Amino acid sequence: MLAPRNTETGVHMSQTEADLALRPSPSLTSMGPTRLGPPPRRVRRFSGKAEPRPRSSRPSRRSSVDLGLLSSWSQPASLLPEPPDPPDSAGPMRSPPSNSKEHPEGTWTGAAPVKAADSACPELTVSSGGPGSREPPRVPDAAARERRREQEEKEDTETQAVATSPDGRYLKFDIEIGRGSFKTVYRGLDTDTTVEVAWCELQTRKLSRAERQRFSEEVEMLKGLQHPNIVRFYDSWKSVLRGQVCIVLVTELMTSGTLKTYLRRFREMKPRVLQRWSRQILRGLHFLHSRVPPILHRDLKCDNVFITGPSGSVKIGDLGLATLKRASFAKSVIGTPEFMAPEMYEEKYDEAVDVYAFGMCMLEMATSEYPYSECQNAAQIYRKVTSGTKPNSFYKVKMPEVKEIIEGCIRTDKNERFTIQDLLTHAFFREERGVHVELAEEDDGEKPGLKLWLRMEDARRGGRPRDNQAIEFLFQLGRDAAEEVAQEMVALGLVCEADYQPVARAVRERVAAIQRKREKLRKARELEVLPPDSGPPPATVSMTPGPPSAFPPEPEEPEADQHQSFLFRHASYSSTTSDCETDGYLSSSGFLDASDPALQPPGGMPSSPAEPHLCLPSGFALSIPRSGPGSDFSPGDSYASDAASGLSDMGEGGQMRKNPVKTLRRRPRSRLRVTSVSDQSDRVVECQLQTHNSKMVTFRFDLDGDSPEEIAAAMVYNEFILPSERDGFLSRIREIIQRVETLLKRDAGPSEATEDALSPQEEPAAMPALPGPSDAELQRSISPEQRSWAAFSTSPSSPGTPLSPGTPFSPGTPPVFPCPIFPITSPSCHPYPFSQVSSNPCPQAPSSLLPSSSGASQVPFPSPSLPTSSPLPFSPSYPQVPLHPASLPTCPSPPPLPSTTAAPLLSLASAFSLAVMTVAQSLLSPSPGLLSQSPPAPPGPLPSMPLPLASCDQESLSAQTAETENEASRNPAQPLLGDARLAPISEEGKPQLVGRFQVTSSKEPAEPPLQPASPTLSRSLKLPTPQLTSESSDTEDSAAGGPETREALAESDRAAEGLGVAIDEEKDEGKEPQIGGSSPILSQPSPVWMNYSYSSLCLSSEESESSGEDEEFWAELQNLRQKHLSEVEALQTLQKKEIEDLYSRLGKQPPPGIVAPAAMLSCRQRRLSKGSFPTSRRNSLQRSDLPGPGIMRRNSLSGSSTGSQEQRASKGVTFAGDVGRM
């Protein structure tokens, strides 16, 4: 027991000694009495919690530092003999061990390191430390709480919306996810769908108001775009951000980065990934370009192609921002130079710029190198791009297929680049769906049925299709659908239902590829057929339009360079074609107005109001005197003069053409047309310009605010017109402004126009002698809201009489129109024929029922279209046709017109058909008295009415006209003017030059004397029914009705007012023309196709020289004509039947005269200019006019004449004796 005590005592003593050594104040002797009572308790308190922390911790720290020293001191003290202690001191010395049971042994020695550790880890002292021991852990706890508080505040900030859309649907959070040069993108939320969106703020402070408005309109257009490869546009609005106006776009949120970030991360793109993503980009571009109007991205690059994480597909983004970027930074960098096509620098671009940018994107994806990275600045890039130098990275492309595609996309000439459709059908981008469709037999390009093979890949044979296990099927173009064929295969068990979509897609793509190939071959053939530019195009393929199954796209042929002022315009306002007419403009009255330059004398030859005007209800006979080439003026010159074009290279006025080759010269030049006129708020005219490089530019100008000089300067600056064309463009714009102002004034006072229509004598005097577009051309472009009353067709009327808004109009109801009024003036004073014909009903009742088939108006009897909107259209080969003194009643006031006069001024109630124009090559008669042999047009039955004749005897006119008709009817088999054919010209006789046209006259029959006839013509006029079936005619009519007898024809002829140049030719059978009304020339000719006699339908001297005497050419033309006749007839019959079925299904009664859409399509007529056009465009430009009800017209302007009366009768077309005959 003593040893432990000694040990414990030794330990205790060593501790005490240590304390004493550290504390120099008290001695050991003085400590004895102090340890009698309280010291042990103090020792216990020292080990307990009573002592303050400084006293308890200080020894602990010191013992830990001096542990080794204290241990060394305690060891010798235990070995030395102890001095004798007082007996009373043993108790206190032993008291600590007695109390040491509460604390384990070694509390002071062994606990010393523990306390040292506690000093390093304060949290361990909490269990035994004093009150101050909680302080050290409180410091890190506060920092953690601060961090948690900041995190919560940040989360609250991020989840709290800082802005909302005007409708409250979209929320903006203050989380920036992207920033560009002019935009900042934040995270947003669609509260309706709870889908995150991208909130884009676009700075527009540098934009003008017009540019801002334009961009807003583009964004509005982009909202409706939904495609899997297009970033969705949800909404947009204007907002004010920090006092600045900005545009906010809400788009689909793309969180997986862009192609640019992908290339930075992976550097190299695998071929299959390149193929798949490139195909998806192409699909997105194809979707944009197939919109109407096409949407151009204009800033396509890898930074704007986003990747969707879940599906791994790509989407094209930043749509519509290129315009804004160009406007904002026009003075620095326009777009992204590395991806900009050469034409982008000129700001003249189309869909091809996106193809160029796509090629650069593919180049970057294939090489992971930025295009033109070798260039130091944008100027070097510009020089390389415009010079056609490819970037250096192009030569690093390893895959030949990819290199070929890139090369085809980045060509300098945009016309040589691939199209999106070409790229989608390229083998590299073709999807492997395990289904292959191929032709079972070679395609000849003609058969409507395709024999195809469907092969399915066999997984057991390495993906190769099985041999001799193809499914052969027949696909009818235009009738079968790929989905229907695939469904039939599924129903028959040939393919499984899971393969329905791949099979349908494969069939659809193969058929589309075959059709594209056929179209290319067809165009190539047409280009081969086209003659050289030295001469006019022959009337071959250009006159054989295909069956008009649907409205074709508008051909790009504006009118600024129309080198002939046609006297006849298209006057159709049917609801089907009113918004898609090409150039058939109308005046407010629907016909040529008095201010039409085609009806005016040239400059320096003013019209004389004192000249008497002979009012002819339907027509009058004309003599055909021989006219030598030395005549001062010819109708050919008048007809072909380019008064309507400010850019004309033709002579003005009555000057004769010195160089006929110059007339039909072709060169690239701008063409201008008026598309719309609006006077709702501002008087705005919209025009369409075809530039010298065949680009279409649509522009508008204010009649009051814009000057022609400013417009011309802008056009020259933008290189839309050449500087050499500026003067012509200026004059053209001035003429358009004058015509539009005249038209708008006339529209403002229709009642005045109606009053003016009653006085035809005053009208020609007011005609300004200004060449330019006629008011008739501008009328069609008047907006429908201003022309709600304009849905009428061409019909005779007094001039300037507008159709009242309440006038009912339907295709089957024949409107009642007054007879046309024609001023007959002296040829010496009026080289241009006048026409005061209007298509609107005159308020007066003395009007005859003159039906018209132009537009939608139909006549209830078998009569071809009889529009009266044109005077006599003189074809290039048409001879001069002055009035014969004996053929028409002469008035006391006008001097007699000698037969030797070279330029008679004629205005007929209806223009001659193309048959007359083409036959006119042989119409030049040697004697001036040939009028009696010209059969007048047999008019239709008209109610009795007084015929207004200006200072002329109506009875004498009727008598003389009837005499002519009797004479003509008595010689039905006698050839009128010989065998007249369009080409080859095989008539005998020396060709003579009429104006600038070479005309050959063959036979000159004797001139029979005129015989008196009954004057009953004035009481019963019959409607002229021109059955025009010459080479140029497109009116092979088939009507319900039996053939007319010769007597009925003669009676019909006697009722005419003497249109004397009625000739019909029968080229196919080689027959002589029948005089007894075999091809009576219309007093109401078909309005539209007469326009084409000048440029392509009749042989002028140039055409004769260039085209030659090729018989095979015309034989082929005849075959094409017959083919198209049958196709159009079948189509029109089918469409008419479908319309009747539709009416029956709707429970309505079909209207009396149903016109099939194919027939209405023929109203889309435009005048042909001298410009060089491919044959396909000429096909689309030449379509016949609407036939009358019951008349089935063939839409072919080509072929030979088959116009004998017997042939017409065999085709069911008759000249009705009265209105009710059908």
UniProtKB/Swiss-Prot annotation:
Q: Which PROSITE patterns match?
A: PROTEIN_KINASE_DOM, PROTEIN_KINASE_ST
Q: Where is this region: Interaction with KLHL3?
A: 554-564
Q: Supply the EC number(s).
A: 2.7.11.1
Q: Which GO terms describe its biological process?
A: aldosterone secretion; calcium ion homeostasis; cellular response to xenobiotic stimulus; chloride transport; distal tubule morphogenesis; ERK1 and ERK2 cascade; gene expression; inflammatory response
Q: Where is this motif: RFXV motif?
A: 996-999
Q: How is its activity regulated?
A: Activation requires autophosphorylation of Ser-328 and Ser-332. Autophosphorylation and subsequent activation is inhibited by increases in intracellular ionic strength: Cl(-) potently inhibits WNK4 kinase activity via direct binding. Also inhibited by K(+) ions.
Which ranges are annotated Polar residues under compositional bias?
1-17, 953-963, 1076-1086, 1172-1183, 1195-1207
A Pfam family the protein falls into: OSR1_C
**Mind telling me where the Glycyl lysine isopeptide (Lys-Gly) (interchain with G-Cter in ubiquitin) cross-link is?**
154, 172, 183, 223, 238, 325, 384, 390, 447, 451, 990, 1123, 1136-1137
Top-rank lineage group of the source organism: Eukaryota
Query: Per the record, which residues fall in region Disordered?
Result: 1-163, 527-562, 591-612, 626-679, 747-809, 836-873, 927-1087, 1169-1222
According to its UniProt record, where is this protein located?
Cell junction, Tight junction
The Gene Ontology CC terms held by the record are: bicellular tight junction; cell body; cytoplasm; cytosol; membrane; protein-containing complex
Q: What is the effect of changing residue 183 to A?
A: Abolished serine/threonine-protein kinase activity and ability to phosphorylate OXSR1/OSR1 and STK39/SPAK
What the record says about family reads:
Belongs to the protein kinase superfamily. Ser/Thr protein kinase family. WNK subfamily.
- Please give the PANTHER family that the UniProt record associates with this protein: SERINE/THREONINE-PROTEIN KINASE WNK WITH NO LYSINE -RELATED
Job of this protein: Serine/threonine-protein kinase component of the WNK4-SPAK/OSR1 kinase cascade, which acts as a key regulator of ion transport in the distal nephron and blood pressure. The WNK4-SPAK/OSR1 kinase cascade is composed of WNK4, which mediates phosphorylation and activation of downstream kinases OXSR1/OSR1 and STK39/SPAK. Following activation, OXSR1/OSR1 and STK39/SPAK catalyze phosphorylation of ion cotransporters, such as SLC12A1/NKCC2, SLC12A2/NKCC1, SLC12A3/NCC, SLC12A5/KCC2 or SLC12A6/KCC3, regulating their activity.
Q: What is this protein called?
A: Serine/threonine-protein kinase WNK4
